[in-house]
């Protein structure tokens, strides 16, 4: 599943295609969304927001399209009038004079008023987004030490969108390697120095992934500035200590780590 950096880059591509352009045609697959098709024609997309792995497409008249790709959903940008042949099921079509954005295969799609947006169950449950520039390491440290999260093992905590939105498995693996911790560690047991390092890494690594145009790939990642240190590198030598990277399963997900320097 794509993680926060990939979702944000997808949102950037969608924005670049249609932001500020009048919609010339709108189509939704789901019957509960059909009443919004005609009223949206002539409106514009003002911006597209990400909250972890959810996209919020904001329209000029105040409505917001909520979508969550889950495992199979995918957005595409195409030239208007050039819808590609595919076996995927089309769910959303937002068309402008020159560009069209298409959402395939997703099933979690809603149209929200401002009041509904403010009280949406998923958005109420999800934590602050790691790509939100307003979020600071001090904020993250406070969350780590809060009663809600301080006694949680990192193997599960770093996958919990209620802690920080946008983290996923490759980020979990790379962050813990960066700070030399294991999935069994808990915030309450760390020194202040370890907490500081982890609080920074929880923001620095996702943001590096985003800014260096990362694409999820099992071999390399993050372009020239960053590559996977341990993710999908079991059996290889750790570049930090020379130990052999191992693979196990933590919180029902593959976990990669170096037992020699992650202690």
UniProtKB/Swiss-Prot annotation:
It comes from the Bacteria. Binds 1 zinc ion per subunit. PROSITE patterns: FPG_CAT, ZF_FPG_1, ZF_FPG_2. InterPro entries: DNA_glyclase/AP_lyase_DNA-bd, DNA_glyclase_Znf_dom_DNA_BS, EcNei-like_N, Endonuclease-VIII, FPG_cat, MutM-like_N-ter, Ribosomal_uS13-like_H2TH, Znf_DNA_glyclase/AP_lyase. A zinc finger (FPG-type) spans 229-263. It catalyses: 2'-deoxyribonucleotide-(2'-deoxyribose 5'-phosphate)-2'-deoxyribonucleotide-DNA = a 3'-end 2'-deoxyribonucleotide-(2,3-dehydro-2,3-deoxyribose 5'-phosphate)-DNA + a 5'-end 5'-phospho-2'-deoxyribonucleoside-DNA + H(+). The keyword Transferase does not apply. DNA binds at residues 70, 125, 169. Its cofactor is Zn(2+). The active site is at residues 2-3, 53, 253. SMART domains: Fapy_DNA_glyco, H2TH. Keywords: DNA damage, DNA repair, DNA-binding, Glycosidase, Hydrolase, Lyase, Metal-binding, Multifunctional enzyme, Zinc, Zinc-finger. One of its GO terms (biological process) is base-excision repair. One of its GO terms (molecular function) is class I DNA-(apurinic or apyrimidinic site) endonuclease activity. The keyword DNA-binding applies. Its EC number is 3.2.2.-, 4.2.99.18. Belongs to the FPG family. Involved in base excision repair of DNA damaged by oxidation or by mutagenic agents. Acts as a DNA glycosylase that recognizes and removes damaged bases. Has a preference for oxidized pyrimidines, such as thymine glycol, 5,6-dihydrouracil and 5,6-dihydrothymine. Has AP (apurinic/apyrimidinic) lyase activity and introduces nicks in the DNA strand. Cleaves the DNA backbone by beta-delta elimination to generate a single-strand break at the site of the removed base with both 3'- and 5'-phosphates. This is Endonuclease 8. The gene is nei.
